[in-house]
Design a protein with these regions (language model features):
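Core RecA-like ATPase module of SF1/SF2 helicases and allied nucleic-acid translocases
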Residues: 1-207
Length: 207
């Protein structure tokens, strides 16, 4: 994972969240944590893989834990009718809040091959991989590129990363890594791509 790996960055940023920690299994959760629903597809297709949200409430018990999640979008009771969660209201921002429980132990029902009762269907996502960020947009994006990862940064990967930001973008890299990455990028014939890369060549590390 490395010092600047996704797991370490997530732990570091979560530590700045002042809300109480709730440990469940091997993971730690806090109210206010940003999350991404993952590949378990428990609530698919209404809530699909990589849907964004935020932990709105956590209610741990001895045998199960209840999560209240603020979604990025608004859904109604008809939309939620057939899914294994409860639509409990809206946040002040007008976003839907759903509630569901996760069991501490997996069901022993051998006839239920698709039992997901003990699966937490999301991951804490202060930081995500560039691959995971495809199709997502954020108001502010910070990209960390180290000398250990610079060789894997192709034109397409770099373009995907920098176009996730709607308003604010920062790239954290050393001058040597910056030069190495930009020299190896294959600038496509598109004038838009070329202009974007020329703008980024002036980016420097910010503390």
């Amino acid at each position: 994972d490395g010092l600047y790996g996704i797991n370490n960055i997530n732990r570091f940023l979560q530590n700045s969240n002042p809300n109480e920690s709730v440990v469940w299994g091997i993971n730690t959760y806090k109210v206010g944590d940003p999350i991404l629903f993952n590949e378990s597809n428990i609530f698919s297709p209404l809530i699909h893989n990589n849907s964004k949200g935020k932990i709105f409430g956590i209610h741990p018990g001895e045998q199960e834990i209840q999560f209240d999640i603020e979604l990025e979008e608004s859904i109604n009771e008809i939309d939620a009718w057939e899914y294994d969660f409860e639509l409990i209201g809206e946040s002040e921002a007008g976003k839907s809040i759903i509630s569901f429980t996760v069991s501490k132990y997996r069901s022993t029902d051998e006839d239920d091959e698709d039992n997901n009762s003990s699966v937490v269907p999301f991951q804490v996502a202060y930081a995500v991989s560039i691959h995971k960020a495809q199709g997502l947009e954020y108001d502010s994006v910070k990209i960390v590129i180290t000398n250990e990862t610079e060789e894997r940064i192709t034109h397409n990967i770099f373009y995907t990363a920098i176009t996730r930001a709607k308003n604010k973008l920062k790239v954290y890299w050393s001058p040597e890594t910056e030069q190495s990455v930009l020299e190896r990028l294959e600038v496509k014939s598109s004038q838009k791509d070329a202009h974007l890369l020329s703008q980024l060549s002036s980016l420097t590390m910010e503390n």
